[in-house]
Amino acid sequence: MSVPMTGRSPAAGDPFYARLVGCWRLVRWDSIGEDGSVEHPMGDPPEGLLAYTPDGTMVTNIGRAGRPAITAGDLLEGPADERNAAFGTFIAYAARVALEGQTVIHDVVMSLYPNWVGSRQRRHAVLSDGDRTLVLTADPFPMRGRMSTQRLTWEKVG
C-alpha cells in the first residue's frame, strides 16, 4: 500500500484531530509485557518529538538519550556494530493520519524500520491536562522477543 504525502488526509478538519495538531515532546515510554512488567525501551527518560500538521501529516523521531557518535564521522558509513547500535536506539517514521473515534491511525509512508512502510499503526489517544498531555497506546506487538503494549506519554511544546 502506498499512501501519498500530498493533499489533505481524512483526519484534517476533525475536531479531535485539531486538538492533536502541534509539536509534542516525549516524556515517558512504557513497554508493558503480558505479565505486567514494565520496561523503558529508549531509557528513562527517552528523547523524542512528535508533530501533527493541520493537513493530517505526522512525523516522529524517538531515541535513547546520550547515543554515542559513530567513530567514522560519515553520515552513511561506519563500523557495522556502531551502525547496528544506532539503528537499535532510534525510531523515525512519517505518515498520513486517519481517525476512528479517538484512535489515531498512522498510515506509514516512510520509516527507519522498513517493515512499517505501508502499514497502519494504530494508537489509542487520550488527551488530558487541558490538552497539554497526550498518551498514545499501541495494540500489543512483538518487541525485543516479547509481546508488549507500548504506552508513550507526550507533552505539548508547540
Residue ranges of predicted features:
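Lipid interaction determinants
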Residues: 1-94, 99-158
